[in-house]
A protein has these predicted regions:
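Short linear sequence motif anchored by a di-proline
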Residues: 1-225
Length: 225
């Protein structure tokens, strides 16, 4: 799975890499589910909540953060999104755990990359006039729509496979347009494990376990392995 990642690439570099205007973003060393994070869709970088809430959901509790590429078209939660609402999730590294030890996996030059994502727009139910309690999800009288996303996963490459049985779909730059705009069959053909030729992994501090920690020390190598 993909449950934590980093994105400390500058706004200008992200804009250059993805062909957008510079986003309003700050360096992130511990991106976690439930947070508002950058995604690329419609030619711009916006922020969406990590954890996909489908349009038909009654509430926004326990949203899935990952979607398996192999079954994504079969699951009601993901089927419409993968057909019509694909996105790129910028990152420059991600974390996986092995026997309690967290590792950061990245390219050896820390270059940014795109993980395959899907997104949704959910309208929270409104509270009916005159009722004293909120509707599902604890929403207010005039709730704002929630934009949310999930990261697509696939089998791991050799490097990640030493740590976990799944990994995020990392798209080659040549595949990004197909993922965003191509027929779903062609898009899913892009969802194999990314080669590990120039990827590296090193152990990091268990401070990354707590999503409240978010500073550069989290990506530093430790002596755990």
């Amino acid at each position: 799975m993909c449950g934590r990642y980093t994105l400390f690439t500058s706004a200008d570099e992200l804009a250059s890499r993805f062909g957008t205007e510079p986003p309003e973003t700050e360096p992130r060393y511990n991106c976690a589910p439930g947070q508002e994070l950058p995604v690329v869709s419609g030619g711009e970088i916006t922020h969406q909540r990590w954890g996909l809430v489908p349009e038909w959901a009654d509430d926004d509790t326990n949203p899935p953060i990952n979607a398996r590429a192999e079954t994504i078209t079969e699951k009601p939660t993901f089927a419409e999104a993968v057909e019509h609402r694909r996105c790129l999730v910028p990152a420059d590294g991600f974390y996986e755990w092995d026997d309690g030890t967290p590792y950061r996996i990245a390219f050896d030059d820390d270059r940014p990359f795109a993980m395959a994502g899907i997104w949704s727009r959910w309208e929270p139910p409104t509270r009916q006039s005159g009722l004293g309690e909120f509707g599902n999800g604890g929403v207010s009288d005039n709730p704002e729509p929630i934009y949310s996303f999930a990261v697509v996963t696939t089998d791991p490459n050799g490097l990640v496979g030493n740590l976990h049985h799944r990994m995020a779909v990392i798209l080659d730059p040549s595949e990004e347009s197909t993922w965003l705009h191509g027929p779903v069959e062609d898009a899913l053909d892009c969802c194999g494990p990314y080669p590990d030729d120039d990827m590296i992994a090193h152990p990091v501090s268990t401070r990354v376990n707590d999503p409240r920690n978010d500073d550069p020390s989290l990506i530093e190598r430790t002596g755990a392995a």
